[in-house]
UniProtKB/Swiss-Prot annotation:
This is Pheromone-regulated membrane protein 10. Pfam families: ThrE, ThrE_2. It comes from Zygosaccharomyces rouxii (strain ATCC 2623 / CBS 732 / NBRC 1130 / NCYC 568 / NRRL Y-229). Residues 516-528 have a biased composition (Basic residues). Residues 29-38, 360-372 have a biased composition (Low complexity). It is found in: Membrane. It comes from the Eukaryota. Residues 15-26, 105-115, 138-148, 158-175, 253-263 have a biased composition (Basic and acidic residues).
Length: 979
């Protein structure tokens, strides 16, 4: 290694050349090898072993004469590569330790490094700077004094050298002081820390991994003489290190001295990472590093290039471009922003509360401050996606009438999800300043203050909000490196003619923020219109969704109030929700329907409870069914269906209450001859008693809730008491059994038990069990009332009649008159329209014919007779629905009501109460208590309920059988409105 190589190693930018001969250079190289071997064994041979920083400052002049050739040269490259640890050679250690001893050791290591890494010294010009040369004599005396302490030096140097083995030395300098275009300084700056190679790829003298970055401040300014003092360079180097350790930092506090790599990292953390970004910027400016700016492009074993070496020794002239201290600029920005008045970035009355994190730049009161945030919208909704023509719209009509309505692939979201979609960006729309007139376009959204997350008008996602600090000052500190990294490039781009401007104390380096309203931009108009169209579309979607929910609830209420088949209510609701694309679930209980509307967007559900008093209104049931079919087949919208449903619900009944009272008496008179064998006289009595029952039900019970709870018991008591009283009149031919049963026929629980049996048959266990049990208890109430009324009159009148059968029945041919009359009467009581009467009468008469003749053939078989009649009724009703598109339920119910009294009359179950009453009277009048009425009383009380169950089971089996024949695969588009 020659002198020129050592000069390049220390970053010397001079144009001088080595004037020595090759023989001299070879001799110096061999001398350096011998001297280094002696230095490794004995530290006393080092003339600078005890030289301290203070001694250098006091005894060495910047221009003192010194013979650089007297110092030994480092070993050759071949020796260092073959034996890296030759003669105890070790790297210096700069690990900080506490106390003066540690500082002295660091200084001694630095001086030894000068000795180990330096080449032949040259004697500088003593008069170059014009200072006193007498300091050289004092320096020589100090050297002689230091030689006398060889013993102590050897004791200290040996362990010290051992501790330096394996340590890395880094002479850190400011990267800004190195000109990347300098062919001499740039290779030194590009040398990677820890590689142990110089710019030519040769191994260093120690053979270990080390990074030696030499700082030569004067070489970048101008070309100097070849007699530059290198000892003065290291003197300044050590002075910077000592000044930097002071608390105030000194004048050269911005510069960095010789320190360890650990301390260098600590300083980078104190500066907020500015050193790291400066290194990244400098690496980008240096050699082409590709996509890894943190790694230097250094070849460990490049080939020697003579032309490159000659270029590196050339003199480079030019002025340094004084760079801006970006850290100080960033700190100044933070300081200036923090010193703004409170009203500049805070509201007097803060509008940014919990849940309201948006701000509108169009109003000064909502300007962004340190505490203002911009909340991210929901990621699962995109306004651009709503208006795309390629996707299906929520308002697209459902495909027309189909034979089958499968479960929808996509259902409409709930109201809550739609509201969230509509209002999630409500404040974002405020960021567009509203136009002051109709012809103005919305203004461009203003960008928040110094916030890179909000660039290009974008709103940060929820993940980026986690990194937003709580104040603008801390946010600026966090982004100071990014701001500083682009400051120099922006200044160079916009002001290429500026050179050597003052960076400190100048407000020109601070960015200016115009306090003006942004200009309007026409390019945001389509986006604004698009967003307004999306909001309008969501509004229409919400309105339509509410209409569909309301239609389902209105439909459910109408079906329950007007007597739809309870075992098919859930099926009707499911079909309706499928057609309307509503995620609905339904659970029916007697008198109550639980409706749940699901919302897949928010994973929530809206539960509605529909409760109403179940009744029977055949005409309104027909109207509700007509509306249902039109909506399901998509010939009517849900909003139009709601209008019609409201009209149906608000309409008055076709038959008023007082007419129903008279019809009650008429039906009682009509049912007495053909069902219970009464004669013509019994018709008048049954009419009178039936009218009383109708008055109790339609007038008294409707006005008193308390009485409605005991209506059945009170009516049975009154009918039994009055009927036995009329039957006890001598010679009147009034039949007690026919009058009593005919008057109570309209309040028999036939329909209730029928609905319960149908529900149980259709696997609706909850509703069917409840209704069936209620029907049994209801029958027991009636039986108890008949018994109590008959017993009361028997106690009052000793000669009360006990006859249960009429001795004078009417001819059976008159039944062809009474059955249609009873059908018309019961249909009018149940609010049937006159256009429905012909079908009802036809089906009812057909059913009774089957009952009459089957009863003649199968005696004492109530279940079988009712089953055959119900089967025929079901066949005719379902054919009417399938062929003539009518409502099967309304046509079949009057015929079923005709079957129930006939079945009950065949068993004479109502008169079991009379037998119980007679037993009670006989028991009280008997002395000695021989009678045992327990068994007969128990059988008489339960016989009526058992008879009702038998009739209902027979009707249920017949109805299901008829539905299976007419609709073997069921109705697919709509539910089967049949019993």
């Amino acid at each position: 290694m020659g002198k020129s190589d050592h000069l390049k190693l220390f970053g010397k930018k001079s144009g001088g050349k080595d004037a020595r001969s090759p023989e001299t250079r070879s001799r110096n190289s061999r001398s350096s090898t011998d001297n280094r071997s002696s230095i490794g064994n004995n530290g006393s041979d080092n003339p600078l072993a005890r030289l301290s920083d203070l001694d250098l400052e006091e005894g060495v002049d910047d221009d003192a004469d010194f013979d650089w050739d007297t110092l030994p040269l480092p070993p050759s490259d071949a020796q260092s590569l073959d034996n890296p640890f030759n003669s105890g050679e070790a790297l210096p250690s700069f690990r900080r330790r506490g106390g003066p001893t540690s500082n002295d050791a660091i200084e001694r290591d630095a001086v030894d490094t000068i000795r180990d890494t330096s080449g032949a010294y040259e004697e500088p010009d003593s008069a170059s700077d014009g200072e006193d040369v007498g300091m050289n004599d004092e320096y020589q005396r100090k050297r002689e004094r230091l030689v006398d302490v060889n013993d102590s030096a050897s004791e200290v140097s040996s362990p010290r050298r051992e501790s330096r083995e394996g340590k890395n030395v880094r002479f850190h300098t400011e990267t800004d002081d190195i000109n990347p275009e300098d062919p001499i300084a740039a290779p030194a700056a590009n040398t990677e820390a820890g590689t142990g190679t110089n710019e030519n790829g040769e191994a260093s003298s120690s053979g270990m991994k080390s990074s030696i970055n030499v700082d030569d401040e004067e070489g970048s300014e101008t070309s100097s003489s070849n007699n530059e003092n290198k000892l003065d360079h290291f003197k300044k180097f050590f002075r910077r290190g000592s000044v930097q350790n002071k608390p105030d930092g000194g004048e050269d506090g911005a510069e960095k001295g010789m320190k360890s790599m650990k301390d260098d990292d600590n300083d980078d953390e104190k500066e907020g990472g500015g050193g790291f970004f400066s290194k990244v910027i400098q690496n980008i400016k240096d050699a082409n590093n590709g996509l890894a700016p943190g790694l230097r492009n250094v070849n460990l074993h490049p080939e020697a290039d003579p032309e490159k070496n000659s270029v590196q020794e050339a003199e480079v002239d030019g002025d340094d471009i004084q760079l801006v201290d970006f850290n100080s600029v960033a700190k100044g920005l933070v300081k200036n922003y923090s010193s703004l008045p409170q009203s500049a970035h805070h509201q007097k009355e803060p509008a940014i509360l919990e849940g309201d994190t948006m701000y509108s730049p169009s109003t000064p009161s909502s300007s962004p401050g340190p505490e203002s945030f911009v909340a991210a919208p929901m990621d699962d909704y995109d306004f651009d996606q709503v208006d795309s023509d390629g996707e299906d719209s929520d308002l697209d009509p459902f495909v027309g009438a189909q034979t089958y309505v499968p479960p929808p692939q996509r259902v409409r979201g709930g109201v809550l999800g739609s509201l969230l979609k509509m209002y999630q960006n409500e404040d974002v729309s405020d960021s567009f300043s509203t136009a002051s007139s109709i012809g103005e376009e919305p203004a461009k959204p203003s960008k928040p203050l110094l916030d890179p997350h909000f660039s290009k008008g974008k709103i940060p996602t929820a993940g980026s909000l986690l990194h937003v600090p709580s104040s603008a000052a801390s946010h600026l500190k966090k982004n100071a490196q990014q701001l500083a990294g682009g400051a120099h490039n922006l200044a160079t781009k916009h002001y290429p003619g500026r050179k050597n401007e003052e960076a400190s104390g100048s407000n020109s380096e601070l960015p200016s923020f115009k306090n003006t309203r942004p200009k309007k931009n026409k390019k945001h108009l389509p986006k604004f219109k698009k967003k307004m169209a999306a909001e309008a579309k969501i509004t229409v979607h919400i309105a339509d969704l509410l209409q569909r929910h309301r239609f389902i609830l209105r439909m459910c209420k109408g079906l329950m109030m007007y007597g739809a088949p309870t075992h098919r209510l859930e099926e009707y609701m499911i079909m309706t929700s499928r057609v309307l694309e509503i995620d609905g679930q339904f659970l029916y209980l007697p008198g109550c329907m639980i409706v749940s509307f699901g919302d897949a967007t928010t994973r929530t559900s809206e539960v509605q409870l529909v409760r109403c008093a179940q009744g029977l209104n055949l005409w309104k049931l027909h109207q509700v069914h007509s509306i249902y079919k039109q909506v399901v087949h998509d010939t009517m919208s849900a909003s139009e269906g709601n209008i019609l449903m409201d009209k149906v619900l608000q309409d008055r009944n076709l038959v008023p209450s007082w007419v129903c009272v008279l019809l009650y008496g008429f039906c009682s008179a009509m049912v007495t001859p053909y069902a219970f064998g009464g004669d013509w006289v019994n018709l008048a009595v049954s009419f009178f008693i039936g009218t009383c029952v109708g008055a109790l039900q339609f007038i008294v019970s409707a006005r008193s809730n308390m009485y409605s709870n005991v209506f059945e018991i009170s009516a049975s008591i009154v009918v039994s008491f009055v009927g036995r009283a009329f039957g006890s009149i001598g010679g009147s031919k009034i039949c007690f059994g026919a009058v009593t049963q005919g008057s109570l026929a309209l309040i028999l629980p036939g329909y209730i038990i029928l609905c319960g049996a149908l529900e149980l048959q259709s696997r609706n266990l909850v509703a069917g069990s409840v209704r069936m049990f209620y029907a049994i208890i209801y029958s027991l109430f009636l039986s108890f009332g008949i018994t109590l009324g008959a017993a009361l009159f028997g106690w009052m009148y000793k000669n009360a009649t006990n006859e249960t059968n009429c001795p004078y029945p009417i001819s059976p041919w008159y039944r062809f008159l009474f059955v249609p009359a009873f059908t018309i009467g019961i249909s009018l009581i149940n609010q049937a329209h006159w256009i429905q009467l012909p079908v009802m009468v036809t089906i009812s008469c057909t059913g009774y014919v089957v009952t009459y003749y089957s009863g003649k053939h199968f005696k004492n078989s109530t279940e079988f007779t009712a089953s055959l009649a119900a089967f025929v009724i079901g066949i005719m009703g379902n054919l009417y629905s399938r062929v003539w598109k009518g409502l099967a339920v309304s046509a079949m119910l009057p015929a079923i009501f005709v079957q129930v009294p006939s079945g009950v009359a065949s068993q004479s179950s109502l008169l079991s109460g009379l037998q119980s009453a007679n037993e009670l009277i006989k028991t009280n009048s008997t002395k000695g208590g021989d009678a045992m009425p327990g068994a007969s009383d128990l059988s008489g009380s339960l016989s009526f309920g058992i008879t009702m169950i038998q009739v209902s089971i027979g009707i249920t089996v017949g109805l299901f059988g008829s539905s299976l024949i007419v609709y073997p695969f069921g109705k697919k588009s709509t539910g089967l409105f049949s019993l």
